[in-house]
Curated annotation (Swiss-Prot):
Its EC number is 3.2.2.-. One of its GO terms (biological process) is base-excision repair. Transmembrane segments: none annotated. GO terms for molecular function: alkylbase DNA N-glycosylase activity; DNA binding. This is Putative 3-methyladenine DNA glycosylase. Belongs to the DNA glycosylase MPG family. InterPro entries: Formyl_transferase-like_C_sf, MPG, MPG_sf. It is an enzyme of class 3 (hydrolase).
Amino acid sequence: MSNLTVRATSTRQPVGLADAFFDRDAQTLARDLLGKVIRHRVGDLWLSARIIETEAYYCEEKGSHASLGYTEKRKALFLDGGHIYMYYARGGDSLNFSAQGPGNAVLIKSAYPWVDEISGPASLAQMLLNNPDAQGRPRPSQKLCAGQTLLCKALGLKVPVWDAKRFDHEILLVEDTGPAPTHVIQTTRLGIPHGRDEHLMYRFVDAAYAQWCTRNPLRRGQVEGRDYFLL
């Protein structure tokens, strides 16, 4: 599962997904983004993480920001698929991509550090420096991006820089690097207040990485067919 021991052996440049990739239903996009790699260039380094957990949001359901109406701050949600929507959650930055249809989007909930010929050990080392724990110590690599704000901190993504922007493939992109997840878990989203459509199963997790996502949907007490579905 892990690729954290891969050594950098090439100067291949990453190839980002076209904007048209994001112009699809939010749930479809949320599933299809699993296994893709977010890459952010900082100086000479590409900081990279494999998407392992996403959440879909629709304008018409109460759990979404878009359901509160259009504002200048939320305008990216109402733009074409592939626009970046960033906001602050619990004091940290969060990353979303607009999907097909005004107000529909996907939240990148968590990821897993990705090391390959483009993003070598030096890139991982920089991500560890970017996102230490509360005592200033390096986090375990597996937990470095285990949450939406941890992900953005590790990758160095900031609301003022990227909100309402398109991808710039020289600096920030999402790349298809290989096989899609073998199994996907579908379950309810996290942090949705009571009465705000918290029952909707719009959260998707790469089953192979379930233990490293924001909250493991396969933890003790969870029942398949009631609490989650395996796709």
